[in-house]
Amino acid sequence: MDLKNGVFHGRPAYWLAILVLLAGLLLSLLWAVTFGSVDLKMGDVYRVILYKVTEALHFPVGDSEVYGSGSMSDIVWFVRLPRLVLAIGVGMALALAGVVMQAIVKNPLADPYVLGVSSGASLGATLAILVGVGSFLGSGYVGLVAFAGAFLVSMGVIALANIGGRATSVKLILAGTALSAICAAVSIFFLYVINTSSGALEAVVRWTMGSLAAASWDTNLWMLAVSVLGALFFWTQYRTLNLMLLGDEAAVTLGTDLHRWRIVYLLAASLLVGFAVYTAGIIGFVGLVIPHMVRILFGTDHKKLIPISALLGAIFLLWSDVLCRVVLPGKEIPIGVLTALVGAPVFIYLMARKKYGFGGGD
């Protein structure tokens, strides 16, 4: 199988990268908590986390009055740490979805936006906020309706791509582009015709630009668990994902029918995007930039690409959230805006610096 090598190749470089990224993620998490309107020391952050974790295990370590309660403990444990953990989970999910969707359609420009999944989520959120669709579901109904929109659009993409024959990578892209345009048009239509308050319009805009401000431990742990399970699942599928880079004809000669796996992987990736949208709104560019960066550095083998992309996506979104909170004092920049502002120049730089094949002899 012709898989392109990156700048760093070989087993030692791969495992070294995994260890460095794991250590970097842990250190980034501790360091990032110190940033905000109230300055904190990393040592205090570590002691608060240590106390809270050991307290949950019924043998608290540390001074309960300093690290178990009070303003510092509340800021670390209930305000900053939850949204950073959410950033890790969402970053992993979006990077994984980008890797998988690019392999499914054999196109390095594919991401949740190209295949219409994000547009479906945006339409769902717009209908929930402006019309009240799904309001009977409770306080988190906007995220649930957005999740449903993402999933329904992914099903629609599969159905359209199978019209007139089996789904191919080109038909998936065309179906995704068409449904994405329809969802965007419907969203704009409702924004135009419905006489609603400025607050509702602001909520729609805020949702479509992404935010981690509503993070809580309940949703965070679910998001993180889904992302980790998704990474493990797709890592076990690296051989089939590598075959997708060769194309259908070559895969059939090797005894693998890619049609069924495209559907399975698209649904699984859509679930990852749906959970990310449910917890954080629409955040773009992560699923496009991170896989490109990893391919340039480590090649196109999905055995390496999947875990490294997941870790790098987590670190990228974690620090993006930090910048959102500290760039403008007293204001928070929507994280989707920042990922685009940071991601687009990085993407252009990487593409200008080194040309590389997508795999399969391209």
Residue ranges and their predicted role:
Residues 1-362:
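Alpha-helical transmembrane segments in inner-membrane proteins
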